[in-house]
Amino acid sequence: MAVYEILKMGDPVLREKAKPVTRFNSNLGRLIDDMFDTMAAARGVGLAAPQIGIGKRVCVVEVGKRRFELVNPEIIEAEGEQCDAEGCLSIPDYTGRVKRFQRVRVKAQDRKGETFIAEGTDLLAVAFQHEIDHLDGILFVDRVENDNPEE
């Protein structure tokens, strides 16, 4: 497996909307495996394909023992609210408070093209939302809450 270099904020690829995956083949499977390896090497909980320079709607998430490969994901249901510190592998050494949904349901496909529904709460919900944002060219810093409105 390969470990990719993770792009940093400022790289224009991170601001582009990723294209849907239409081919479900061994190349996609290798990409997903490499993304899990890259995420683990960087000690992250999620990674989106644009973060490694690939403009496809693919992301991986691992929270605790729950591991997800999400191809063409979309949030289909969301409720509640949480506001916690968030960070990003593409923006090292920076965290900020971000308001997110507390629970989300995500419709996605796996590496074989099979559709499934994943549900997450708390950190898992944050990870799903954060990675799907990457697929839309949105970075978490775009959503950081201003803790001091006087500034």
Curated annotation (Swiss-Prot):
Removes the formyl group from the N-terminal Met of newly synthesized proteins. Requires at least a dipeptide for an efficient rate of reaction. N-terminal L-methionine is a prerequisite for activity but the enzyme has broad specificity at other positions. This is Peptide deformylase. Its cofactor is Fe(2+). The gene is def. It comes from Heliobacterium modesticaldum (strain ATCC 51547 / Ice1). Binds 1 Fe(2+) ion. It is an enzyme of class 3 (hydrolase). The lineage of its organism: Bacteria, Bacillati, Bacillota, Clostridia, Eubacteriales. PANTHER family: PEPTIDE DEFORMYLASE. The keyword Phosphoprotein does not apply. NCBIfam families: pept_deformyl, PRK00150.1-3.
